[in-house]
Amino acid sequence: MAKAASTRPRRKERKNISSGVAHVLASFNNTMVTISDAQGNAISWSSAGSQGFKGSRKSTPYAAQVAAEDAGRKAREHGMETLEIEVSGPGAGRESALRALQTIGFSITAIRDLTPIPHNGCRPRKRRRV
């Protein structure tokens, strides 16, 4: 008979990475922050939804700030000190996520805006009438 797998939780090893890239995706509905090493391997991540915000509260700047602080704290545990920031998307959490990463104590070397802009591509969705 096969041996049962142990139920003891596996301890996450501490990586020693000094610099990395913070990818901030700020959509209209949520803000996601992923911090990776230079090769693109994810070190930590967080989103407004994973921090307990639901519905329209996920798209607020405060929710983006909380998500960025959480992802940044996890990355600091792995020894990360310098960051390049890549921001994409039109959401409200762009600036506040960037500011939150600065206040944690990261030294920011570059900020890039990677928001995709169509050169007259697909037809956009209809305008909202509220």
From Swiss-Prot:
**Keyword terms:** Ribonucleoprotein, Ribosomal protein, RNA-binding, rRNA-binding
Task: Give GO terms: molecular function aspect only.
Answer: rRNA binding; structural constituent of ribosome
An example Gene Ontology CC term for this record: ribonucleoprotein complex
Q: Any one Gene Ontology biological process term?
A: translation
Q: Which family would the database say this protein is a member of?
A: Belongs to the universal ribosomal protein uS11 family.
Function description: Located on the platform of the 30S subunit, it bridges several disparate RNA helices of the 16S rRNA. Forms part of the Shine-Dalgarno cleft in the 70S ribosome.
- Summary of subunit composition and partner proteins: Part of the 30S ribosomal subunit. Interacts with proteins S7 and S18. Binds to IF-3.
Which PANTHER family does the UniProt entry name for this protein? 40S RIBOSOMAL PROTEIN S14/30S RIBOSOMAL PROTEIN S11
Q: What is this protein called?
A: Small ribosomal subunit protein uS11
